[in-house]
Amino acid sequence: MTSLKLLKEKAPLVICITNDVVKNFTANGLVALGASPAMSEFPADLEDLLKYAGGLLINIGTLTDENWKLYQAALKIAEKYNVPAVLDPVACGAGEYRKKVADDLINNYKLAAIRGNAGEIASLVGIDVASKGVDSAGVDNIDEIALAANEKFNIPIVVTGEVDAIAVNGEVVTIHNGSAMMPKVIGTGCLLGAVIASFIGLEKGQELKSLETAMLVYNIAGEMAEKRPNGHLPGTFKVEFINALYEITDEDVKEFKRVK
């Protein structure tokens, strides 16, 4: 099984093309975990860096026409060097423009995984789910949404919420770990996309296990952070979450995981 130990040994370079709000939090989270982040946003630089990368994150949170072109260029280069790319289609259900960009990236470029909340992933497959911007209300059929997207796109899917669902090759698992404090801190979902990009390329052909490990490490770190002094407060939780990502071990994952 893909492990946190393996990630720390390989220390993959992860290119993060992400939104302006979360760059610092994302970089610090990846460093704490054991990966090596780079926030490059220029095609010539990406050509150089992606030769050595273990993963690429495309997060469309800060969307512009120029950024759309950047996403396209990055995905072309990633495919050239066989770098697994993860798409976070932020708020793609909020309007036609975001949906158009997400559809373009999914249908015309090679992706290793798509990560989004229930509202975002449901919008990609035409399922109605109550959502508002980047947020999504509690959803009971999250596993069905994940499976529908996996079947439609033939791409591994991660749907996040109170319960998380992972669908790969028609198989679905649900993750029941996590902290209620995570939605209280901006950027936790965006960092998750980068964490997935860190794990997804560690072992070829083991996408389900890689995604499961990424989700468990992330969610159990959230549980650890919330239990610490003042972890119920957003400011403290944010700091303690980074600390927990630094300290969490494979033994913690094995002991506390709740997977169905």
Curated annotation (Swiss-Prot):
Which pathway or pathways does this protein act in? Cofactor biosynthesis; thiamine diphosphate biosynthesis; 4-methyl-5-(2-phosphoethyl)-thiazole from 5-(2-hydroxyethyl)-4-methylthiazole: step 1/1
The alphabetized UniProt keywords are: ATP-binding, Kinase, Magnesium, Metal-binding, Nucleotide-binding, Thiamine biosynthesis, Transferase
From the UniProt record, list the reaction(s) this protein catalyses.
Answer: 5-(2-hydroxyethyl)-4-methylthiazole + ATP = 4-methyl-5-(2-phosphooxyethyl)-thiazole + ADP + H(+)
Annotated residues that bind ATP are located at R115, T160
Q: Where does substrate bind?
A: M39, G187
E.C. designation(s): 2.7.1.50
How would you classify this enzyme at the top EC level? Answer: transferase
- Listed InterPro entries: Hyethyz_kinase, Ribokinase-like
Keyword Cell wall biogenesis/degradation set for record: no
Q: Which GO terms describe its molecular function?
A: ATP binding; hydroxyethylthiazole kinase activity; magnesium ion binding
Q: Where is the signal peptide?
A: none
The cofactor named in the record is: Mg(2+)
Q: Name one GO biological process term.
A: thiamine biosynthetic process
Check the record and name the SUPFAM superfamilies matching this protein: Ribokinase-like
UniProt-listed Pfam families? HK (PF02110)
Note the NCBIfam families from the entry: PRK09355.1, thiM
Chain's role = Catalyzes the phosphorylation of the hydroxyl group of 4-methyl-5-beta-hydroxyethylthiazole (THZ).
Which protein family is it in? Belongs to the Thz kinase family.
Identify this protein by name.
Hydroxyethylthiazole kinase 1
Question: What does the organism's lineage look like at the top?
Answer: Bacteria, Bacillati, Bacillota, Bacilli, Lactobacillales
